[in-house]
Every structure is written in structure tokens, then in C-alpha cells.
């Protein structure tokens, strides 16, 4: 069996992921506020309530590939207690999960499996890429390793590290919760492509750049 990979073009017309065309637009709630103050406030409160329930009840899909999954599993222990964020309910079926954590090295033969499992997840769904191997292939710049899972599925949060610590995984959960809290999804019962507004989140590298540049006294290797 032959496997092929296709790079994602967010603005492409014939791309499978994402199903809708992505473009930077204004928050649709602003239009409702100017149109009707009462209905705008009511819809804003309804969106906040729905997003609050979604972001505080994230069920991860139990899917690990290599050593990064060990660090992810460590976050479920009593020391870290990821249950504080409502993400302790591991699901063995993609149809019952809210987000997938691709933790570890993604090989070429594994890519179609991950893509199929992603298709089986129900909306709304999110993806976290955990570790250098999942982000960009890591040290494995070879023919059998995919150079980043974002080549065939959309990724919402990237976790750097080889492997990242459990604290990094919990920080990714907080960033994902913050992003979900700013989303605007259709509230009707109609199933279909109705458009999803996602906030343009600033990366942690850009957010902390000024603080890191301002540091004058660097720690010695013994103090790190």
C-alpha cells in the first residue's frame, strides 16, 4: 500500500482540511451588538455559557506514539492532577473525545490512521501536537517520519520539548481553553458548514519576547 502526504494550504479551494476556507474576519458578535443591543448581549451571554462548558470539560483521546505520551500520562497522577482542568476523562473512542493529543513520533504509515481517527471525531474538536517529533519531525529527518502532523491535520496548540514536561502539557490545556472561550460557533441544531470564528491567538514566543529580551542577569547552568 502506498502512502502519500499533502501539505495543508489553509486558503486552498480543494483542501480537505479545514473543510471551510479560513480567513481573518471581525468578531461576528460585534455586528449583532450594533444591530440590536438586547439580542447582542443575550447571544454574547449564551456563547460565553456554551464555551465555558466546552472548555472546562475537555475529554482527551487516549492516543500516544512514543515517549511524549509518558509525560502526558504523568500529568494524570496525583502530583499534577490534570483533573483540575476537567481533562481527566480519557476516551478510548474518537467519537467520545473532544480533542486529540498527538504525542510522539508520527511515522508515514501512521499518518493515515491518525487522519482517519480525526475524521471520526465529532465537532467541535481540537488537536494538540505534543513534542518536537510531532511538531516538526524532531531529530528524525528521514523518509519514514512525517515532518510535522500539521501537514495532514489542523493543529490548534503546539507543545515544544523533547519530551515536554507535564507542566507544558497543562499549559497547553490552558491555552486551548483560552482559545475555546473566544470561539464563536453556530448555536443552531442544523448540521453543516456554517462558519466558525476563531480568535487570532498570539504565540507564546511573541508574547514573551519582550520579557526575555529585557533580562540582564542570566542564570548560570548550575542554577537552571
From Swiss-Prot:
BP terms from Gene Ontology: aerobic respiration; electron transport coupled proton transport
Localization: Cell inner membrane
Recorded topology in the membrane: Peripheral membrane protein
Name used for this protein in its record: NADH-quinone oxidoreductase subunit B
PROSITE patterns to which the protein is assigned, alphabetical: COMPLEX1_20K
The species this protein was found in: Photorhabdus laumondii subsp. laumondii (strain DSM 15139 / CIP 105565 / TT01) (Photorhabdus luminescens subsp. laumondii)
Cofactor note: Binds 1 [4Fe-4S] cluster.
Main subcellular location of this protein, as a coarse class: membrane
Gene3D superfamilies from the UniProt entry: 3.40.50.12280
NCBIfam families reported in the protein's UniProt record: nuoB_fam, PRK06411.1
Reactions catalysed: a quinone + NADH + 5 H(+)(in) = a quinol + NAD(+) + 4 H(+)(out)
Membership in a protein family: Belongs to the complex I 20 kDa subunit family.
Keyword Cell membrane: yes
A Gene Ontology term for the protein's cellular component: plasma membrane
UniProt: [4Fe-4S] cluster binding residues: 67-68, 133, 162
Cofactor: [4Fe-4S] cluster
InterPro entries in the record: NADH_UbQ_OxRdtase-like_20kDa, NADH_UQ_OxRdtase_20Kd_su
Keyword tRNA-binding carried by entry: no
Stretches assigned to coiled coil: none
Pfam family, one: Oxidored_q6
PANTHER family: NADH DEHYDROGENASE (PTHR11995), NADH DEHYDROGENASE [UBIQUINONE] IRON-SULFUR PROTEIN 7, MITOCHONDRIAL (PTHR11995:SF14)
Amino acid at each position: 500500500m502506498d502512502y502519500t502526504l499533502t501539505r495543508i494550504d489553509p486558503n486552498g479551494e480543494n483542501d480537505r482540511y479545514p473543510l471551510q476556507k479560513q480567513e481573518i474576519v471581525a468578531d461576528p458578535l460585534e455586528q449583532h451588538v450594533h444591530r440590536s443591543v438586547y439580542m447582542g448581549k443575550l447571544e454574547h451571554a449564551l456563547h460565553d455559557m456554551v464555551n465555558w462548558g466546552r472548555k472546562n470539560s475537555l475529554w482527551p483521546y487516549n492516543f500516544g506514539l512514543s515517549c511524549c505520551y509518558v509525560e502526558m500520562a504523568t500529568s494524570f497522577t496525583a502530583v499534577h492532577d490534570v483533573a483540575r482542568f476537567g481533562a481527566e476523562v480519557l476516551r478510548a473512542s474518537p467519537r467520545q473525545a473532544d480533542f486529540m493529543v498527538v504525542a510522539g513520533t508520527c511515522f508515514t504509515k501512521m499518518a493515515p490512521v491518525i487522519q482517519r481517527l480525526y475524521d471520526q471525531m465529532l465537532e467541535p474538536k481540537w488537536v494538540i501536537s505534543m513534542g518536537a517529533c510531532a511538531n516538526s519531525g524532531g531529530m528524525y529527518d528521514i523518509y519514514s517520519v512525517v515532518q510535522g502532523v500539521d501537514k495532514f491535520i489542523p493543529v490548534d496548540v503546539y507543545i515544544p520539548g523533547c519530551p515536554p514536561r507535564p507542566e507544558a502539557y497543562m499549559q497547553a490545556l490552558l491555552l486551548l481553553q483560552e482559545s475555546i472561550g473566544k470561539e464563536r460557533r453556530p448555536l443552531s441544531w442544523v448540521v453543516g458548514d456554517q462558519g466558525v470564528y476563531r480568535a487570532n491567538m498570539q504565540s507564546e514566543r511573541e508574547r514573551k519576547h519582550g520579557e526575555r529580551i529585557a533580562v540582564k542577569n542570566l542564570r548560570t547552568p548550575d542554577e537552571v
